[in-house]
């Protein structure tokens, strides 16, 4: 069984090309049966590869998309894929629709991989993700652009000063004394240029 990678995408470019891609993906979703037999359904990335004229055997496409939305300018959706992003699919999209570019933010918590290609933070400015369970068992997951705002938020949750990684570790230790299931995970998104 793989670790699953959740990836949020934004695709922008020439409006007609964005719309054409949206209509292609929406049409695939609405099929009664997938165009290529698979275990993911009609929104399998391999169906998109096939519709673009590619061979799904040659392109990493182990997963599906969901949450498809077109606001008239940009296309947004997310994917759930095995182990990592399936950006090869979107490189194929770019071959068919040359004006398009894609931005993504990927999270694969099983291996602690968090990354984005949104260098300027145009769509995904957050560089940190905190996931925690307090001493009272309250769960929180939040995104932050910088450590300062993360620490300020954590300070509000905890009711004690938090200004450094050492403060976070001390807080986690105090919470664990009260509730052994308490934890604080801070994940930093690596920024890659595709």
Q: Which residues does each PLM region occupy?
A:
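Intrinsic low-complexity, intrinsically disordered or marginally ordered coil/linker segments
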Residues: 1-194
């Amino acid at each position: 069984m793989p670790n699953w990678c959740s990836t949020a995408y934004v695709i922008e470019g020439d409006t007609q090309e964005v719309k054409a891609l949206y209509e292609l993906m929406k049409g695939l979703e609405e099929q009664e049966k997938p165009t290529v037999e698979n275990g993911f359904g009609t929104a399998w990335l391999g169906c998109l590869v096939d519709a673009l004229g590619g061979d799904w055997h040659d392109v990493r496409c182990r997963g599906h998309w969901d949450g498809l939305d077109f606001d008239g300018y940009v296309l947004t959706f997310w994917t759930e894929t095995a182990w990592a992003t399936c950006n090869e699919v979107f490189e194929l999209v770019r071959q068919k629709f040359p004006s398009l570019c894609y931005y993504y933010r990927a999270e694969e918590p099983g291996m602690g991989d968090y990354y984005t290609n949104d260098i300027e933070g145009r769509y995904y400015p957050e560089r940190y993700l905190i996931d925690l369970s307090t001493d009272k068992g309250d769960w929180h997951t939040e995104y932050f652009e910088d450590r300062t705002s993360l620490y300020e938020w954590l300070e509000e949750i905890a009711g004690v000063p938090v200004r450094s990684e050492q403060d976070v570790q001390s807080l986690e230790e105090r919470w664990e004394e009260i509730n052994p299931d308490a934890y604080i995970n801070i994940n930093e998104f690596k920024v890659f240029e595709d």
